[in-house]
Amino acid sequence: MIINKAMILAAGRGERMRPLTDTCPKPLISVDGAPMIDHILDHLEEIGVKDVVVNTSYLGDMLHEHLEKRASPTIHFSDEDRPLETGGGVVKALPAFGEEPFFVINGDVVWSDQKANCLKELSQSWKKDMQALLLMVPLDKARGYQGDGDYNMNSHGVLRQKEPGEKATYVFSGIQILRPSIFKGLEPGRFSLKAVYDGLEEKGELYGLELKGLWFHVGTPEHLASTREWFEQHKDQHGEKSA
């Protein structure tokens, strides 16, 4: 199935990236020669996505000014008076997607595909009976990440979140495909997508796909510096695609 619409979550404050985010929304911070959100949009355009919703709140005018200069894909804005978090932001934007599944991507995700496009692979792995498909990163492919992961995944791709004190095999990348119907009955407001994942997990309907490339945890200025250094060192590698 071809996934031809997407949403980029760009309304957050980026507290841990201060002081850089005091004057710039985090998705506009540059990595590998361009703002993080531009790399994401380039990858979406590459696989044929035509329409992208970007939610904004903190320093939203800067995102509008920057993104309105793009010729493609077509950008639609979902402006929030106050940040609605990941789940609430998606619910507010749902009318743009109709009944078809769509990508949801954090606006500060950085990855290196290594001659592939993980968004294309995610789209090709989507099955008509799926409700959610999350791109998962093995801990040894998560640069700068020092946590204990988020989920384990069985041979059928079914995800199970780790138990307290357990170390999981995968960390969630912030990249996914979701079906609009999973939000049916949810009231508009501020809430996290994790509440939706938890409900799907209980029914055995939360699926994952392993990222084949590298993913970079860009949470602080220190992480940003090390990520920029990595891309500078690898800029001459042919076929590298970053976001």
Identify what each model region corresponds to:
Residues 13, 24, 59, 212-214:
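A generic "binding-loop/recognition-motif" signal
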Residues 1-19, 28:
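N-proximal low-complexity "stem/linker" segments adjacent to membrane-targeting elements
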Residues 58, 133-150:
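Short beta-strand-to-loop element that shapes/binds the nucleotide-sugar donor at the catalytic cleft/hinge
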Residues 1-8, 34-106, 110-112, 117, ...:
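Conserved N-terminal catalytic core of the sugar/cofactor nucleotidyltransferase
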Residues 23-36:
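Short catalytic helix/loop segments, enriched in acidic residues and glycine
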